UniProtKB/Swiss-Prot annotation:
This is Serine/threonine-protein kinase atg1. Belongs to the protein kinase superfamily. Ser/Thr protein kinase family. APG1/unc-51/ULK1 subfamily. It comes from the Eukaryota. The gene is atg1. PANTHER family: NON-SPECIFIC SERINE_THREONINE PROTEIN KINASE, SERINE/THREONINE-PROTEIN KINASE UNC-51-RELATED. Serine/threonine protein kinase involved in the cytoplasm to vacuole transport (Cvt) and found to be essential in autophagy, where it is required for the formation of autophagosomes. Involved in the clearance of protein aggregates which cannot be efficiently cleared by the proteasome. Required for selective autophagic degradation of the nucleus (nucleophagy) as well as for mitophagy which contributes to regulate mitochondrial quantity and quality by eliminating the mitochondria to a basal level to fulfill cellular energy requirements and preventing excess ROS production.
């Protein structure tokens, strides 16, 4: 599809030619995670195509099924501004997708090389007529031309209820101008996917032709997985996607705004080193889009960009208004005489009529050759394509405009006559595969629906559009709020294929949505809101969260925690998983667990594990009691502490809360350990360093800005990636178990032990509190699960990349991997870790190291409060090692599950390693020993606290409170 992105390997070693059907595969021109793109040529007509070869061994079953479904849909999409799928061939090892060839590459390269376009034979005339301004990127005539063609393609997709979801300059491919084909300037002639493939539906025929590429593959065949995309270049993603919020087709309009800005200015509107910083910049900008003073863009273009780049999708320009915008519908100003229309054609650039209006040159014999040959070829597509190669006229009509020309179609089976109105009587239907959704704000159900692509076009969207158009401006905001909330409960969200445990991710998010939006749970939350219960930050300007509102009023909102106590070091908003990672102050970059891990950390590869950050702003002060959960009413609050047995008689709901919180806390300890490894692989960006004036790396050495890996060797990267990956997988398993515990509780409630007049309305209110607390923990688990999934995928890709850089004789080099040593199930690419690397072994060694270091410090009287944290963390980590995947049965005492603990088998610890662990000491004995040390330490701390004078408000206390870790204590993240 592009001829400009030649890989270095293809230039050094020419690829052998290969016959694929009627085409010959030539040199490699691009490479992605799942596919390699080659230049190809038709064996008879010698016209060019792009051949995308997908390696089936890198796809799991779901990705293969989704790919087949998407190919079936793509064969029915024929539009001048969408790269067409011409043919498809499948072998035992690959699927070869034959697509239209775009000789000018993509728009990002076009903008980057704007200063040299005058030297290229395909763009020399364009620059002569419309030179690029010195203070901008592209001439506004060219910008409007590309925007019209992009809008035409989006209108075509919108009419078919399709969303691209990955609009960016890299996916906008360019072909030489249609006039250059007729004049003979263009020597590389592409094969035509349809009769009108290179006849523009709108815009100018003397300028390059824009086509959207990779449509549909965002769901079934991503160029990169979710984590890689977010950690790579999410510069064009809508903020609602970055926030893991509900999103719909309006996300495409944000992307259009970023592309339009880049065409005008020469760079994206928001740039950052990672998606966390990117989202922060978008939020900080508060919809104030600035342009360079010397930029010559017109006010009309700037106003359109500002209308598209609205953080709130409700405030963002909608599709009808976008398609009717003057920039889209009005003639392009500033045309040279040669490009002025010779005859009146009404609005010459209106996408509503341009596609149905015959062009003087659209049937010229001098157009791109290959179409007539296509008629002589006979069938070339696989079975089942007959119904897709002949398009009914009704699918080419725009906004009810009568069809006046031969419909745009692919001629693929002999000399087929043009479609007649009779052929359009049976409406074309496209089977829509079940969406792998993880609804962020509302429960959803996966269904297989055959949607009528002709006139059954998502009535809820049509209703939204007509509603917003016909409403007065004064009521527009309220009407949009109501309509967006109703639609948010139905539309598809997060249709992304996580490479790791994708199905589990869908289940986790679906259950969290169901619990969060249950009227019974929501009623409890609203009653407890005044005491600090969970509230929601509206993504739109709606009523304040504290006001009582119906349960559906929370749909489409993101999480926010309102702590019961106002404290300078604890006030924070939870918005997805990102802001917990990088807070707004240096204190939020760590936690008590991080401190405990740092205290026990040795030196690895000459680097420290993380910077020694102060817990609070006052320097040395009592460490905050660590707990990862949101703050909520603590009526008889359970104290997690160190997990020791309590003699209190607990009802079933309270037991569920206790077990759930303990399991989630163990997962958080493992997550904190994994973060130690992760932060070495991904050094902190300059904007989130604790000391802005310091440019030192984690080892205290001067940072090298040119070092992408922070100075780590390849062996170190492999080791860190392996350890981080197995720890993240362990954390995911604990989070999944926590969600299973909550799911079992919820199932029992739905079977009969309901809320309201029964269990949840007891006099002491314990069950009401339990429901609220379980919901809060479930929402935390959901956010953490998604975050760990994303980071785990990043580490997986980092590991695969680093292993390829190892010497060929290294045991971890991909060529030396055995089939049976791969990690993970269902992953698109198998991950192989070195023998002996397991999460349980790492956690066991770390727990022993932490407890021993804490014991030494306790004996010397140093940092007793830190010793307490280290003991608790070590206990939790060892409990996580002993954790199995079974959900506890209720009615069974917690201690009953550990009666057979001597028979526990550590799944990931190999036989020889298990023997080493057993020889040292049984884990249960280690836990008991650490608990005894912790009890003695707390007695010592209590005695010291009684003897010590009460510290003043300005002098932080050296010793911490002896109270166990409370559920309600939420440290800054």
């Amino acid at each position: 599809m592009t001829s400009t992105h030649h890989s270095r390997r293809s230039r050094e070693t020419p690829q052998p030619e290969m016959s694929i059907g009627r085409y010959t595969r030539l040199d490699e021109i691009g490479r992605g995670s799942f596919a390699t793109v080659y230049q190809g040529v038709h064996t008879k007509t010698r016209t060019y195509v792009a051949i995308k070869s997908v390696n089936l061994s890198k796809l799991n079953k779901k990705l293969k099924d989704n790919l087949s479904s998407e190919i079936h849909i793509l064969k029915g999409l024929y539009h001048p501004h969408i790269v067409a799928l011409i043919d498809c061939h499948e072998t035992t090892s690959h699927i070869h997708l034959v697509m239209e060839y775009c000789a000018l590459g993509d728009l990002s390269l076009f903008i980057k090389r704007r200063d040299t376009l005058g030297d290229h034979r395909y763009t020399r005339d364009m620059i002569a007529k419309y030179p690029n301004p010195p203070g901008g990127a592209l001439n506004e005539v060219v910008v409007r031309h590309f925007l019209k063609q992009l809008a035409s393609a989006l209108k075509f997709l919108r009419d078919r209820n399709l969303i691209h979801r990955d609009i960016k300059p890299q996916n906008l491919l360019l072909c030489p101008s249609p006039s250059s084909y007729r004049s003979g300037v263009t020597q590389v002639v592409p094969f035509k996917g349809s009769e009108d493939s290179f006849n523009p539906a709108t815009g100018l025929e003397s300028l390059p032709l824009l086509k959207i590429a990779d449509f549909g593959f965002a769901r079934s065949l991503p160029a990169t997985s979710l984590a890689e995309t977010l950690c790579g270049s999410p510069l064009y993603m809508a903020p609602e996607i970055l926030r893991y919020e509900k999103y719909d087709a309006k996300a495409d309009l944000w992307s259009v705004g970023t592309v339009l800005y880049e065409m005008v200015v020469g760079k994206p509107p928001f740039r950052a080193t990672n998606h966390v910083e990117l989202l922060r910049k978008i939020e900080k900008g508060e919809d104030r889009i600035k342009f360079p003073e010397e930029n010559p863009a017109s006010d009309e273009i700037k106003a359109l960009i500002r209308a598209l780049l609205k953080r709130n999708p409700v405030e963002r320009l909608n599709f009808p208004d976008f398609f009717q915008n003057g920039v889209i519908t009005s003639p392009i100003p500033g045309l040279v005489a040669d490009d002025l229309p010779s005859i009146p054609q009404g609005p010459p650039a209106d996408p509503e009529t341009a596609e149905a209006t015959p062009r003087p040159d659209s049937r010229s014999g001098a157009t791109v050759p290959g179409g007539t040959e296509r008629e002589r070829e006979g069938p070339s597509l696989p079975k089942g394509d007959t119904g897709l190669t002949q398009r009914p006229p009704s699918q080419n009509q725009r906004f009810g405009t009568p069809q006046t020309t031969t419909p745009m179609r692919r001629i693929g089976s002999g000399d087929r006559p043009p479609s007649t109105p009779k052929e359009s009587t049976p409406p074309m239907t496209y089977p829509q595969r079940p969406s792998a959704v993880s609804h962020a704000t509302a429960p959803g159900r996966q269904e297989l629906v055959d949607r009528n692509a002709t006139f059954t076009a998502m009535e809820r969207q049509k209703g939204r559009n007509t509603f917003s158009e016909g409403s007065p401006q004064i009521d527009r905001q309220a009407d949009k709020l109501r309509e967006e909330r109703e639609r948010a409960a139905q539309d598809v969200a997060f249709e992304r294929d996580y490479v790791v445990v994708e199905k589990r991710a869908v289940e986790v998010n679906a259950f969290a949505d169901e619990l969060a939006h249950s009227p019974r749970i929501q009623g409890n939350i609203s009653r407890g809101a005044q005491t600090g219960a969970l509230s929601r930050r509206s993504t739109v300007h709606g009523p304040t969260p504290s006001n009582p509102s119906p349960p559906q009023a929370t749909v489409g909102k993101a999480m926010q925690v309102l702590s019961g106590r106002s404290r300078a070091d604890s006030m924070h908003n939870r918005q997805g998983s990102y802001e917990r990672r990088y807070g707004q102050s240096p204190t939020s970059a760590t936690s008590a667990i991080s401190k405990a891990l740092n205290m026990a950390s040795g030196r690895l590869f000459g680097m420290g594990f993380s910077p020694p950050l102060a817990i609070t702003k006052g320097g040395r002060s009592p460490p905050l009691a660590y707990n990862p959960f949101p703050a909520y009413p603590a009526h008889g609050s359970l104290m997690i502490g160190d997990g020791a047995k309590s003699n209190l008689a607990l009802d079933e709901d309270t037991k569920t809360v206790q077990i759930l919180e303990e399991c989630a806390t163990r997962s958080d300890v493992v997550y904190g350990f994994a973060e130690v490894k992760y932060k070495q692989l991904v050094p902190l960006a300059p904007s989130v360093q604790t000391d802005p004036s310091s440019k030192l790396n984690l080892a205290g050495e001067r940072e090298n800005p040119d070092s992408a890996d922070g100075g780590l060797t390849v062996d170190a990267i492999v080791t860190l990636s392996e350890e981080a990956l197995v720890l993240y997988v362990k954390a995911l398993s604990l989070l999944a178990k926590s969600m299973d515990i909550a799911g079992a509780w919820w199932a029992r409630k739905n079977r009969g032990d309901g809320f309201g007049d029964s269990a949840m309305s007891r006099a002491n209110g314990a069950s009401t509190l339990a429901g609220t607390r379980i919901n809060n923990v479930v929402q935390w688990i959901r956010n953490r699960f998604n975050e760990v999934l994303e980071k785990g995928e990043f580490v997986r890709l980092k590991l695969i990349e680093a292993q390829k850089r190892l010497p060929p004789d290294h045991p971890s080099h991909p060529d030396n991997h055995s089939v049976g040593s791969s990690l993970g199930s269902g992953a698109s690419v198998d991950v192989v870790v070195s023998p002996g690397v397991s999460a349980e072994k790492l956690m066991y060694d770390r727990a022993l190291e932490m407890s021993r270091t804490a014991a030494i410090n306790e004996l010397t009287g140093e940092d007793l409060s830190g010793c307490e944290i280290a003991y608790v963390t070590a206990i939790r980590m060892l409990e996580a090692v002993l954790e199995n995947g079974e959900v506890p049965r209720f009615g069974q005492d917690k201690d009953d599950t550990s009666k057979d603990s001597d028979k526990i088998v550590l799944d990931a610890v190999q036989a020889d390693e298990r023997q080493v662990v057993i020889k040292l000491l049984t884990i249960q004995a280690v836990v008991a020993s650490i608990r005894s040390r912790l009890a003695a330490l707390r007695k010592k701390l209590a005695i010291l606290a009684k003897r010590a004078p009460t510290p003043s408000a300005n002098v932080p206390s050296k010793m911490a409170s002896s109270n166990p870790v409370s559920v309600g204590a939420t440290p800054p993240k």
